[in-house]
């Protein structure tokens, strides 16, 4: 089967989605295990992105997109966390959230800030879907609401 031009956007989108999921996993692993950014990026690129590990084949991911998200979140965390905190309900602190939810919100907020070429709806939808991969109930709704508020604040638009 050959790649036709119409196949390319779908393939690129799927690889970006896989990169987003891997970035969330890497950010989670960094927070829980205290792993540094260089070590985690090297581990994911060598053993996870498009690789087989413990009988599971990881999706092929856009490695540069993955690196951009992980390194950008680490670099900009002091800017991202207050944005996320201001989008949470008054009685919730970022530290109260599950580590996976924090990783999802940080990655999504980073993309909303830095990836102006990607529509808000795409970013929010992708990270809500990632939340659904880990959680069944309230967390995907929380991710949707928080990223939607942040998008309105920094881009002046909501997910449509």
Curated annotation (Swiss-Prot):
Record bears the keyword Kinase: no
GO cellular component: cytosol
Alphabetized GO MF terms: RNA binding
SUPFAM superfamilies in alphabetical order: NusB-like
HAMAP family (alphabetical): NusB
Keywords of this entry: RNA-binding, Transcription, Transcription antitermination, Transcription regulation
Domain of life the protein comes from: Bacteria
Role: Involved in transcription antitermination. Required for transcription of ribosomal RNA (rRNA) genes. Binds specifically to the boxA antiterminator sequence of the ribosomal RNA (rrn) operons.
Protein known as: Transcription antitermination protein NusB
Record-linked InterPro entries: NusB-like_sf (IPR035926), NusB_fam (IPR011605), NusB_RsmB_TIM44 (IPR006027)
GO BP annotations, alphabetical order: DNA-templated transcription termination; transcription antitermination
Lineage, broadest ranks: Bacteria, Pseudomonadati, Pseudomonadota, Alphaproteobacteria, Hyphomicrobiales
Family: Belongs to the NusB family.
A Pfam family assignment: NusB
